[in-house]
């Protein structure tokens, strides 16, 4: 897409991948096709997106790994149809709307979960 903000030398991309315009991809991200990332998304450092579809204005947090997922708004759907509401599951600090202007500070429980998963936390900001 047009006006994609990415340092392609510091991002791992393989297979057919579409990236929509105005999307920001941070260094260290990995994108494996077939994958489609809609316009105005923000893919944070170390995120892995594999065989997935990410709809417009999605923010994928640092270290998040998505395999065969469909992300739209506050919902995430797996290949088998399992789905969950990111806000209700208190995971909107990992995957959220890229247009959010507020900062979301992870709770102590979220920090502990991230430590167990080996995921580095960043504040959710657009």
What do the predicted segments below correspond to?
Residues 1-126:
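Left-handed beta-helix
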């Amino acid at each position: 897409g047009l006006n994609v903000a990415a340092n392609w030398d510091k991002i791992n991309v393989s297979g057919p991948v579409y990236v929509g315009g105005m999307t920001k991809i941070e260094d260290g991200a990995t994108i494996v096709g077939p994958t489609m990332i809609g316009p105005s998304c923000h893919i944070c450092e170390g995120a892995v997106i594999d065989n997935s579809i990410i709809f417009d204005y999605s923010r994928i947090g640092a270290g998040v790994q998505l395999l065969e997922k469909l992300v739209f708004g506050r919902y995430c759907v797996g290949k088998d149809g399992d789905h969950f509401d990111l806000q209700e599951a208190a995971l909107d600090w990992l995957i959220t709307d890229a247009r959010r202007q507020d900062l979301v500070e992870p709770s102590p429980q979220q920090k502990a979960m991230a430590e167990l998963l080996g995921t580095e936390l960043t504040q959710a900001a657009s």
